[in-house]
């Protein structure tokens, strides 16, 4: 392991202790400095991104980079506006550090507080998306977490430029510790980072299925993330057709390269003849490749719609991240739910229905981190969920699930305030009893 890698991590770990106690006022000043710096340095960011895009175009020609990754790589003025708005949204969020989550009296003058605190040092490993840097850095800063960033080599110039702009703004703010945010740039550094479980408290990988699986399988550090976004919409027989056409179109076409776009459309057989032909026309006019099961293929072929492809069994398990959609007809809502729970990735799935009992069954039985009713799966996003931004989407069955904002970057500690009590007084034949009484007290109010 290169010593400079370990020294960066150790420096960030030390800075994480200081960062955990920085005041809300100072953190917000640093965040505003970040926003202003991005606005001021637009040209530098766009110039750096242009270099990455030029190199990416060559890699795409050689088949080494997909169009989906190229799309995620591109930075524009409007994307910079989004970065700035995202940071300022985080400023508006309540500082979650030091919140009293519960208070319990164990006995008179022996009070136990459960208080929120930062995780510590977080490693964020991501592919192709330079906007991850300001998005995650702002959330980690506000929640008091030091962060190591490792972006994909295809975004090296963009990541480096944005990172340097932001860190300069942060470290020029009085009261902010130096070294809390670090950047790694080579592929070899990933393996070094994965081995530093003595210092790094959490890893958040953002990228392809294979990429996230690789991270999970090669580290002892806890990993927050999802391996893929195989999302579905089920169109029920009790449906408002205009709603179904609009929502299903948006869920695939609005931005197909992201993990909350649908990959499979399930349609109740009783509504297929009425719903599917127009839906297919809309998709085909938008350039979507349709991979149909036997029944949907026969229905659309009979209507003279083309081009069509036949779905294979493999298609039900594929995340396309592109203008490709699998279509399957089902007999019942149970069949749809079983298909989703078998082939889905527990990310985001939806139902279009006007029937309350179908809605309740679907939301109860679909095992996904977000379940949509008569709304696009594309809403599964930290910003849209009012979190300011997100560090990632988790399909893990832990405390943080779905789009993870600042609340997923916090843990808690127990603080016990006493007046000389000892356990011996609460043991043995004449043991004092515990009161175990819940109190409405805040640790921050204690003198």
Swiss-Prot record:
Major enzyme class: oxidoreductase
Signal sequence segment: none
Single GO MF annotation: NADP binding
Transmembrane feature ranges: none
Keywords for this protein: Amino-acid biosynthesis, Cytoplasm, NADP, Oxidoreductase, Proline biosynthesis
Chief location: cytoplasm
Reaction(s) catalysed (UniProt annotation): L-glutamate 5-semialdehyde + phosphate + NADP(+) = L-glutamyl 5-phosphate + NADPH + H(+)
Protein location: Cytoplasm
Pathway, per record: Amino-acid biosynthesis; L-proline biosynthesis; L-glutamate 5-semialdehyde from L-glutamate: step 2/2
PROSITE patterns linked to this entry: PROA
InterPro entries (alphabetical): Ald_DH/histidinol_DH (IPR016161), Ald_DH_C (IPR016163), Ald_DH_N (IPR016162), Aldehyde_DH_dom (IPR015590), G-glutamylP_reductase_CS (IPR020593), Glu-5-SA_DH (IPR012134), GPR_dom (IPR000965)
GO terms for cellular component: cytoplasm
EC number: 1.2.1.41
GO biological process, one term: L-proline biosynthetic process
Biological function: Catalyzes the NADPH-dependent reduction of L-glutamate 5-phosphate into L-glutamate 5-semialdehyde and phosphate. The product spontaneously undergoes cyclization to form 1-pyrroline-5-carboxylate.
Recorded family membership: Belongs to the gamma-glutamyl phosphate reductase family.
Designated name of the protein: Gamma-glutamyl phosphate reductase
Originating organism: Methanosarcina barkeri (strain Fusaro / DSM 804)
Gene that specifies this protein: proA
């Amino acid at each position: 392991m290169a010593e400079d890698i370990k020294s960066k991590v150790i420096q960030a770990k030390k800075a994480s202790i200081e960062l955990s106690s920085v005041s809300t006022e100072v953190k917000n000043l640093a965040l505003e400095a970040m926003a202003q710096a991005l606005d001021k340095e637009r040209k530098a960011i766009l110039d750096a991104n242009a270099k990455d895009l030029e190199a990416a175009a060559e890699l795409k020609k050689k088949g080494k980079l997909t169009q989906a990754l190229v799309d995620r790589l591109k930075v524009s003025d409007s994307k910079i506006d989004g970065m700035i708005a995202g940071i300022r949204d985080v400023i508006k969020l309540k500082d979650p550090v030091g919140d009293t989550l519960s208070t319990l009296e164990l006995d008179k003058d022996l009070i136990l507080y459960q208080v929120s605190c930062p995780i510590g040092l977080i490693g964020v490993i991501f592919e192709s998306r330079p906007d991850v840097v300001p998005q995650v850095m702002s959330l980690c800063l506000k929640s008091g977490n030091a962060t190591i960033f490792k972006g994909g080599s295809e975004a090296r110039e963009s990541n480096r430029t944005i990172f340097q702009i932001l860190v300069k703004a942060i470290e020029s703010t009085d009261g902010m510790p130096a070294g809390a945010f670090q950047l790694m740039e080579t592929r070899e550094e990933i393996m070094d980072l994965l081995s530093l479980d003595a210092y790094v408290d959490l890893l958040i990988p953002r990228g392809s299925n294979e990429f996230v699986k690789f991270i999970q399988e090669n580290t002892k550090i806890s990993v927050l993330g999802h391996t893929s976004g195989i999302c579905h919409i089920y169109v029920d027989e009790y449906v408002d057709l205009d709603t179904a056409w609009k929502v299903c179109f948006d869920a695939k076409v609005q931005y197909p390269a992201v993990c909350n776009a649908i990959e499979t459309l399930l349609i109740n057989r009783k509504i297929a003849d009425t719903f599917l032909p127009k839906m297919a026309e809309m998709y085909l006019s938008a350039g979507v490749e349709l991979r149909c099961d036997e029944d949907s293929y026969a229905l659309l072929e009979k209507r003279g719609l083309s081009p069509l492809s036949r779905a294979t069994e493999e298609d039900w398990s594929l995340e396309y991240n592109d203008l490709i959609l699998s279509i399957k007809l089902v007999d019942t809502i149970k069949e749809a739910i079983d298909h989703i729970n078998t082939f889905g990735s527990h990310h985001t799935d939806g139902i279009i229905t006007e029937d309350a009992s179908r809605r309740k069954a679907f939301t109860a039985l679909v095992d996904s981190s977000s379940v949509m009713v008569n709304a696009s799966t594309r809403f599964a996003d930290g910003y849209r969920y009012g979190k300011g931004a997100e560090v990632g989407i988790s399909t893990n069955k832990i405390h943080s699930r779905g789009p993870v904002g600042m609340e997923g970057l916090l843990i808690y500690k127990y603080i016990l305030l006493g007046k000389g009590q000892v356990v011996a007084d609460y043991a043995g034949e004449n043991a004092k009893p515990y009161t175990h009484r819940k109190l409405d007290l805040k640790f921050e109010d204690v003198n």
